[in-house]
């Protein structure tokens, strides 16, 4: 993928707060399921914003670094999803989303970002991302000191 879309920590907080606003009233939710690993940070933010204490994970492995591969379910709470909010950072090809829908047909499924191939599989999302764009998540980056321009030239 040649294009990149960078999400900062501030962006992530803002996007998740927007998602949380849409999930009111919070009392309708029994809990939150974060899709590991990308949905873990958004799940924590939604849990805070909505005051939800019951947070669990569904663990599906479908990426090996930046390449998609076969899907493996590593952990899955056993229920149909009724009363649960499922959160992931992104819906891309839709493969993971299809599996989530199959496993939890009664849950509400939201993502922070959505690409065209998968966006119809989620109930809500905040940011549209072109299909050919790689998303740089804040947890994949480090903050580092950058030398001022005037010092580099000496």
From Swiss-Prot:
Transcription regulation is among the record's keywords: no
Known EC number: 2.4.2.-, 2.4.2.22
Organism of origin: Vibrio cholerae serotype O1 (strain ATCC 39315 / El Tor Inaba N16961)
Domain of life, per lineage: Bacteria
GO molecular function: guanine phosphoribosyltransferase activity; hypoxanthine phosphoribosyltransferase activity; magnesium ion binding; xanthine phosphoribosyltransferase activity
Protein name: Xanthine-guanine phosphoribosyltransferase
GO terms, biological process: GMP salvage; IMP salvage; purine ribonucleoside salvage; XMP salvage
Lineage: Bacteria, Pseudomonadati, Pseudomonadota, Gammaproteobacteria, Vibrionales
The encoding gene: gpt
Residues binding guanine, per UniProt: 92, 135
């Amino acid at each position: 993928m040649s294009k990149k879309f960078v999400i900062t920590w501030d962006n992530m907080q803002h996007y998740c707060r927007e998602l949380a606003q849409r999930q009111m009233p919070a009392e309708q939710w029994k809990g939150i399921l974060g899709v590991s690993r990308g949905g873990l940070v958004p799940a924590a933010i939604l849990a805070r914003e909505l005051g939800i204490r019951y947070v669990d994970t569904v663990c599906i492995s479908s990426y090996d670094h930046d390449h998609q591969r076969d899907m493996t379910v590593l952990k899955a709470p056993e229920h149909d999803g009724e009363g649960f909010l499922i959160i992931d950072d992104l819906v891309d090809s839709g493969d993971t989303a299809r599996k989530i829908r199959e496993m939890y047909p009664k849950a509400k499924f939201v993502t922070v970002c959505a690409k065209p191939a998968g966006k119809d599989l989620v109930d809500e999302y905040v940011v549209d991302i072109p299909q050919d764009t790689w998303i740089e998540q804040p947890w994949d980056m480090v903050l580092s000191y950058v030398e001022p321009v005037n010092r580099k030239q000496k």
